[in-house]
Amino acid sequence: MYELEKEKYLGNTKKSFNTQQGIAVVETEYQNKVYEGWHSHNNAHITLFLKGGTTEKRKNFSETVGPGSLLFYHSDELHLNQNTLFPSRNINIEIEENLLKDLQLSEAVIEKSVQNSAFTKFLILKIFKETLTSDTFSADTITMLFSQISNAQNHLERFEKSPFWVKSLQELLNDCWNENPNLQDLATVLNLNPITISKHFPKYFGCTLGEYMRRIKINRSLSLIQSHESNLTQIALECGFADQSHFIRTFKSQTGFLPKQFQKL
């Protein structure tokens, strides 16, 4: 068991960007087998898996992750990785303790935000896009984007305390993720007044119905794009978009990348 220093990971570092404000963005890739024992990292970090995958083990759970998966690691938290697929590639957002204090955030808040996976994934992709832009505004922009992570946690807390119909609505929307339901359709299924959904949806979901459905669709598309098994037109139709151009516009709006740019990451 050993502890990795700041901005160090078991894989090869392909790109690293330090804002000098408490955030480091590190892109890592795994081409060959690496150390599979217990280890930890100095700083807390969020990892978005872009390609490949691995079996992630902690003291209390084991999980197989792949493209589009999102995990949070507390500072000094012991974990190990086994059965890594090659090649694998990850984006790691590493957070200094001092920045958490400045933003009045805790590791627990960040861990909670990861449960709102689509919103947090898209923030990470936008942060990574800023590292590729890498101009005089990028460091401040990355800090501003990261500070939004608390929004995901706030809406999760409201969601957990919500009426029963809200959870039923979430399940329904995720079940029909590749469809385009309207308020009347949803209200009929849930035996509600459409105004009830319209009035309370932003409070519990943190956005409009249309925005939520776009997030679900684009979130589902991430693994489809990285699998290279379908072209963009097929993916657009599979995810319920009217055409490829609509899909491309929505994908860029949510992630900061064009689909083909994301595919090449």
Model segments located where?
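Short, Lys/Arg-enriched N-terminal segment that forms or immediately precedes the first helix
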Residues: 31, 152-157, 203-206
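An amphipathic alpha-helical interaction segment
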Residues: 93, 97-104, 113-180, 184, ...
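Short, conserved glycine- and acidic-residue-centered signature motifs
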Residues: 42, 162, 214
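N-terminal regulatory/effector-sensing and dimerization cores
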Residues: 2-3, 9-109
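Conserved coupling/switch loops of ABC nucleotide-binding domains, chiefly the family-specific signature
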Residues: 51, 258-260
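The DNA-contacting recognition helix of HTH DNA-binding domains
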Residues: 194-195, 199, 244-245
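Terminal helix-turn-helix DNA-binding modules in bacterial transcription factors
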Residues: 171, 175, 180, 184, ...
